[in-house]
Amino acid sequence: MVEVKNLTKTFGGFTALKELNMTIPKGAVYGLVGPNGAGKSTLIRHIAGIYRPDSGEITIDGEAVWENPNAKAKLGYIPDDLFFFKSATIEDMRRYYRGLYPSFDDELFQKLGEKFDLPRKSPIRKFSKGMKKQAAFWLTVSCRPELLVLDEPVDGLDPVMRRQIMGLILADVAEHGTTVLVSSHNLRELEDICDHVGILDKGRMLLERSLADMQGGTVKVQFVGEVPDGLTILHRTDIGKLRTIVVRATAQEAEAVFERAALPFYEVLPLSLEEIFIYELGGADHEMQNIIL
């Protein structure tokens, strides 16, 4: 389990993270979402042990991450801005990773080499962005980390490779119980793989819970007629006779209210992660217009 407690970080007087708390259950695929500048990459770099907190702490299975080789040996980190040694090949990096990670799995490395059709003896710096991303996954997953930390993991990949990478992540979770933290702007892809979500804004955690609980506690209802009593309405729009409301309720609770109202038409719809994201940030002075699709 990963725990972040009261984490604060400032840069030159700017507070990037403020008293932030976060919990990633063991074996979870945790999606970290937020607008640009929310502090996602800063938070990820703290969890990866790159940044030192001004205050607060980050632990993996109870061990502090900062300046702790034992804790860092449990995690694999793939940043958005990849780094490889200047003239290093994949084979060079394999030897380097083997020296850092006692858990490095040569058999898995060879197996993944069949999926990632990359030249092993060419300098990685000559690879395209997508090829570099594939190389990073190949090497990092071969380390068999207990915690996989990913910042925009499929950026720069074509649709086929994006699907393959996501499948690789899920297979690793299923087979080895790997815990995954992934930050991405592609909320629809996150929705396909994540079971927990945290929404970050202005250096604070607005909301974190399981995706099922998040989607189950708020629904969208489209209907014709007057708005029934007994609903906590979070947002409303009318287009002609068709009304759409977002309510704080389960689907069953909303259906019970509308059944009693005996309206000529109603439909209860789940909210996507993208809609939840827009709605939750709508309460923090962000645009709400796209929540009604």
Predicted feature locations:
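Residues that scaffold the ATP/ADP-binding catalytic core of kinase and kinase-like folds
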Residues: 68, 230, 276, 280
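C-terminal coupling/interaction segments
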Residues: 246-293
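Short, flexible helix/strand-to-coil boundary loops that buttress conserved ligand/catalytic motifs
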Residues: 69, 215-218, 258, 281
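ABC transporter nucleotide-binding domains
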Residues: 2-4, 9-188, 192-195, 199-201
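Short loop/turn segments at beta->alpha junctions
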Residues: 89, 210, 269-272
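A broad structural signal for short, well-ordered beta-strand segments within beta-sheet-rich domains
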Residues: 19, 218, 233-234, 263-265
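ABC transporter nucleotide-binding domain
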Residues: 164-251
